[in-house]
Amino acid sequence: MLKRFNQYDNFIFDFDGTLADTACEVLSCIERAFNKCNVAFDKERLNPSVMGPSLAEIAVIVKPDLTDEQIVNNIVAEYRKIYDYDENDITKLYDGIRDWLLYLKQNNKKIFVATNKPKIPTLRLVKSLNIDFFDDVYMVDKYDDKKLTKQQMIEEIVSKYNLLKEKTIMVGDCLSDIEAAKKAGVLSLVALWGYGADKKALKDKSDFYLEKITND
């Protein structure tokens, strides 16, 4: 299972677009939040290409003339109510992900999550998707008194677990994941099955890239 990476000891994974395909669930909850707030929008603008930015930014992408900050905040709040505890979540792991994670664990590799996703839905999904065996899970709101950037998450994981940077890979699907890895001094592996749109740039800027999970 991706044996060519056996020389590396530590793997830090992004969540949305890397481990799991969350787009359908997220977009459905955004639509429900807009409807709950009685805000009309062009449904054609609500597609997987909007994935990545914060919810507030997505709301404005979906409805460019939405300039009232309070309405944006209301949409975000409604989304959180719907998404955080959705018992009918349709999120699914990408093909081969669980097997890869198990392979890494069985070969004494350390595995982590570093995601801009909030704590409640992240921990809910890690459990419901049956991948709750990470060495640690870092989320944007892991701490109550501060928000973490992706770079800070990586740096703290490296420091807390005494990881060698040259033996550590950040696995993500967006340019921001690659940039965070470089700033934190670790290697980057881009998952081309994710939401990052510019595949050429992702290939050019990352240390490694994967189009699919294989047994080599």
List the predicted regions and their residue ranges.
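Conserved Lys-Pro-Asp/Glu-containing loop-to-beta segment of HAD-superfamily phosphomonoesterases
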Residues: 10, 149-178
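Short, acidic/turn-prone active-site loops that include or flank metal/cofactor-
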Residues: 139-145, 192-197, 214-215
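Acidic, Mg2+-coordinating phosphoryl-transfer loop and its flanking beta/alpha structural elements
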Residues: 170-211
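Substrate-recognition/cap helix-loop segment adjacent to the acidic, metal-dependent catalytic center
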Residues: 35-37, 57-66, 90, 98, ...
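Short acidic capping loops at alpha-helix termini that bridge into adjacent secondary structure
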Residues: 41-45, 70-71, 132-136, 165-169
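N-terminal helical cap/lid subdomain that shapes the substrate entry/recognition surface
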Residues: 5-15, 19-98, 103, 107, ...
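Structural recognition of alpha->loop->beta junctions
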Residues: 129-139, 200-216
